[in-house]
Amino acid sequence: MKIGKIDYETFSRFLLDRLGKKDKTVLVPPMTGVDAGVVDVGGGKVLVIAEDPIFTMPMLPLRTFGWFTVHIGASDVAVMGVKPRYMTYSLLLPPETSTKDLKTIVDSIHKTAVELGIAIVGGHTGYYPGLTAPMIGGITVFAFAKKGSYVTPAGARPGNGVILTKGPAIETSGLLSVLRERELAKKYPKSLIRKAKALCREITVVEDALVAMMAGGVTAMHDATEGGVIGGLFEIANASGVGMEVYENLMIYPDEVRMVCEAFAIDPVAAIAEGSLLITAGAAFVPKIIRRLERAGIPASVIGTVTKDPRKRTMRRRDGSVVPLAIPKQDPFWPAFFKGLSL
């Protein structure tokens, strides 16, 4: 069964050369590992724009689903170093959805957008057979910025430090602790499970990215979504044409993340990690970025360096083994997620 994002080979074969009319105003077109597009709109300004679908699961509160919708969409603009400003969304609902549930979702989306300073300027809402739960067919988030003021995952340079916020497998741990709570409760303390469930409200990198950008020296940012931290690191290195040496033992590892990954035999660095921000920055700026993040209540650590040789992109694992940075063939979150749905 094919689950999640298409792989690099499929993207290259079927999408990369099917991007509509060529337009010289497109400065950053669709490409693997790049979270948003950039268009020159004249007057020294650019439009930064991103698109995402959002799914939910039956036991996730609808308020949280609404919160996810805005934060996940906004994160893809924020990682370009630009504050999100506008959004549209398409809310698709099963026909049996109550007006109470509809109100809960749209109230949450509205409230979250207000908190982030985002105006909702369009969208679509409707009831459709075949759906078993509400979903966002697409959220589009965009903003204007000065030309040259944004970053992309292609900006990493040799000598840069590599920073990771929060640690690996944030989204994996949060969602699975909700979906498979009863299984965890048989083996682990309630206090740790509560911490894991609270990670659902950490599935965002909006503040992480904007704080880092304000500190200065950032050359690239990327949120570690499908394929996790190891996949996200590869995408930065590949887009930038550089090498990278990173160390798993330098990553922050919350106990609740260890618990979930241990319980379901998941490799933390390979699992979907929305909420974990990867940053490369000039070495002189790294301490300042870490301080600013920690001052904002966002844990972060330096996990390695960017190197010159693109043939050498490695991660030293906690057991001492050295593995190449690569996008996992299968994100380990999905089998654990669908097994949980079937229980």
What are these regions (language model features)?
Residues M1-L343:
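Helix-biased detector of long, well-ordered alpha-helical tracts
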